[in-house]
Amino acid sequence: MQNNNAIEFDKVNFSYGRERVLHDVSFSINKGEKIAIVGETGAGKSTIAKLILRFYLPNEGDVNFYGESSRQVSQKWARKNIAYVPQESFLFRGSIKNNLIYSNPEGINLEQELQEIGVLDWFERYENGLDQEVGERGANVSAGERQFIALLRAVLAKREIIVFDEATANLDIESENSILDATDTLLAYQTSIVIAHRLETIINAEKIMVMHDGKLVGFDNHKNLLKDNEIYQELFSAWNLVN
């Protein structure tokens, strides 16, 4: 798998039953690129994420990873090389530390990594710091704290590709800014795809994919889309009103 295109959609069509949700979608994402996907509810954003994660295969067309068809790529390869953070994440019973190193237990100096990316102080809110017990499914921490820990866990796993599916939706602004700064540092050489809902996430992306009614209607940086793409202009105006 030496192709510089980490991910390529080639005329992808996909349906849930009789409902077509993606229509002839084509794009490529280079290794190491930071991509945001935007669009209204039902535009096809999460379906793209699920195809990247190989939860599904396309009905027509193909999804390629480094030049190899998703039909040939094993689930084992996908689990080893692609990390996923949904909007509602879960934690394992045990300490925060054990949750953070779960996907990379042997290859990480946790405190050093957290210090280098500027989030170690965040854990001082807990009486026992990184040794704090989170409880079954993270019952002892808030929803926002649970999501922050899950986001860091995925980033620290150091997969080649990482998909965030509206993963910062439950975070307060301070925590979201902390995780965005952390991902900028930790994901310097990884390919990341963010299904975005806040302006800060969108603007910082290298390129933004604009979905509308299951079709890709724009794929460029924020400045160019804001100038030339009517759908993006409407989305951006709506976000400005909300925020």
Q: What feature does the model see in each segment?
A:
Residues 1-243:
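ABC-type nucleotide-binding domain
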